[in-house]
Design a protein with these regions (language model features):
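Conserved Rossmann-fold SDR core element
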Residues: 125-141, 173-178
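Conserved catalytic-site loops of classical short-chain dehydrogenases/reductases
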Residues: 60-63, 78-82, 86-94, 131-134
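Adenosine-cofactor binding site in Rossmann-like domains, unifying the SAM/SAH pocket
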Residues: 31-53, 67-70, 74
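Catalytic loop of short-chain dehydrogenase/reductase
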Residues: 84-128, 139-143, 150
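C-terminal helical subdomain
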Residues: 135, 150-216
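N-terminal Rossmann NAD(P)H-binding glycine-rich loop of SDR-like oxidoreductase domains
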Residues: 7-26
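Conserved NAD(P)H cofactor-binding loop of Rossmann-fold oxidoreductase domains
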Residues: 63-71, 94-97
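Short-chain dehydrogenase/reductase
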Residues: 76-80, 117-122, 162-165
Length: 216
């Protein structure tokens, strides 16, 4: 499934992205990771350097995992447009927050746009568009967004979350365009800390040091 394939993973140094990257490496893929540590900060150049490098790599499989305001959607849309005539796969890490709001509007609207784009383009595959798209709206995962929250059985393990995404690589006689992968829920009174801390972490990560073009 992965051996010998050219694979790109954004956000490959922690959480789900790290698990995807290591799984692909172990299974013989030619995998390239994109993160600040590898010189590909999503804040830089609105993600253009990442997109250009993935195009130069001519990746066959892209795990569009990392999020930054507007950039994750930009990566999806440009790669998809460029690859309409090629048998590629783009697997996006969305968020269940586009179904169950936590109050982080930019994050949630970005993730909803990611989902909606994949669903809208699904009717073109494969007769008009050979590039296959998937989106997984992922629930609470033990990752950076929950930093500071005590671990509990309501988290999805990052390795298990990675497998949900990786299993979409193999072509089937059907296409699972959108998947909602929920963690286990508890009564809302027990989820308040989780929700509030996640919201604070997302908002913190959205506080940009430099004003970006989409804010003007």
């Amino acid at each position: 499934m992965l051996r010998g394939k050219r694979v790109a993973v954004t956000g490959h140094t922690s959480g789900i992205g790290k698990e995807i990257y290591e799984y692909c490496q172990f299974n013989g893929a030619e995998v390239r990771g994109y993160s600040r540590r590898s010189g590909f900060d999503m804040k830089d150049r609105n993600g253009d350097h990442i997109i250009n490098d993935i195009l130069r790599l001519d990746a066959e499989i892209v795990f569009n995992h990392a999020w930054y305001p507007r950039v994750q959607n930009k990566i999806l849309k440009i790669l998809h447009t460029q690859w309409k005539e090629k048998e590629k796969v783009i697997i996006n890490t969305g968020s269940a927050t586009c179904y169950y709001s936590i109050g982080a509007s930019i994050y949630e609207s970005d993730k909803a746009e990611l989902r909606d784009y994949c669903i809208a383009k699904a009717t073109d595959y494969p007769y008009k568009d050979k590039c296959r798209l998937h989106n997984v709206s992922m629930g609470w995962t033990n990752s950076a967004v929950l930093e500071g929250v005590e671990e509990g059985d309501y988290f999805i393990d990052p390795y298990e979350a990675a497998l949900v995404l990786i299993n979409l690589v193999m072509p089937q006689n059907y296409v699972m365009t959108e998947i909602v992968c929920n963690a286990k829920f508890k009564p809302m009174k027990n989820m308040v800390q989780l929700r509030d801390k996640a919201t604070a972490n997302v908002i913190r990560d959205m506080q940009l040091e430099v004003k970006q073009p989409w804010e003007e």
